[in-house]
């Protein structure tokens, strides 16, 4: 493991000094290799699925793990999308000239060596590799033991893509052991060779990484996402957005987990929204006010407001306007993604101002909380901390900066 850190440093230097065209070629070659290795990757995934089912995994958790031909094509297409994203390395984000003639530029640079610790989703292996190469960073990938065969098969394709482009395979390494001790070594910093650790998974994984890591951590908390239907909402729009936000794909972190209804119009808004959700197979758990309108709902507990279901279950609360919605979100949300449905521009602006989440949407589904949907090609996660990045983390967010100062012989008096 310690050797991985040292070779990753060498890989990071090679990526940093590579041309944008070389990095693009490597990412494109990764996508080609993933398609070429489709049979091997799907066979490996079948092994992971069989073991997961034998261990009692089912429902959304099994869905997160599963690949089929269509999903694998989506993985390859996602890698290609990253190749099409502008290369951020070396880009001057600002530039100015001082009165003494010094020319100063703020220039994007790679972070260095990134360690990615994640669970379940094998597509993260490809997304993280592509984004790190695009941003000039080396990466050490430590996926969960539940998808180790899938991850290693995808990594083999990625390594071949790097080789085809003439870049070192040390730039993207995968931890090949399921031993949990490997995570501890990464958290210890691998002899100070890791510049950033990114955890992506359940609350316990993120909490452990944040508590034990000796390197900086880019946090990705669970998606305790809310949709607030304001009194001035268009009812048809509200029904469509709420159903999509919850049920399009319940196992993603952008899935809505709580529905907030404005008490000023709850009697009108809640029944048709609840009816559409129930008909679509969603279980509703409401507070007293919500159940007074829709008695068929189960009673919501305090735990429901802080639970990322990742299942067709939705908590429902009636709140007092924008201020009440913002208070509920501040009390129970995770700072991930929250939305308002309204035709009132002032209410929308108030919601935007009051809700301090990484992503705030107006009249759109929370399922748009995705780097691909933001035009980033893919994402390495949704950062819920405020430093150093926030929201979908794409290639640009995986860079830092340096100041380049050009002079003509100036000395300081």
Curated annotation (Swiss-Prot):
It is found in: Cytoplasm. InterPro entries: Ald_DH/histidinol_DH, Ald_DH_C, Ald_DH_N, Aldehyde_DH_dom, G-glutamylP_reductase_CS, Glu-5-SA_DH, GPR_dom. Gene3D superfamilies: Aldehyde Dehydrogenase, Chain A, domain 1 (3.40.605.10), Aldehyde Dehydrogenase, Chain A, domain 2 (3.40.309.10). Keywords: Amino-acid biosynthesis, Cytoplasm, NADP, Oxidoreductase, Proline biosynthesis. Its main location: cytoplasm. The keyword Cytoplasm applies. Pathway: Amino-acid biosynthesis; L-proline biosynthesis; L-glutamate 5-semialdehyde from L-glutamate: step 2/2. It comes from the Bacteria. One of its GO terms (molecular function) is glutamate-5-semialdehyde dehydrogenase activity. SUPFAM superfamilies: ALDH-like. GO terms for cellular component: cytoplasm. The keyword Cytoplasm applies. One of its GO terms (biological process) is L-proline biosynthetic process. It catalyses: L-glutamate 5-semialdehyde + phosphate + NADP(+) = L-glutamyl 5-phosphate + NADPH + H(+). Its EC number is 1.2.1.41. HAMAP family: ProA (MF_00412). Belongs to the gamma-glutamyl phosphate reductase family. Catalyzes the NADPH-dependent reduction of L-glutamate 5-phosphate into L-glutamate 5-semialdehyde and phosphate. The product spontaneously undergoes cyclization to form 1-pyrroline-5-carboxylate. This is Gamma-glutamyl phosphate reductase. It comes from Caulobacter vibrioides (strain ATCC 19089 / CIP 103742 / CB 15). The gene is proA.
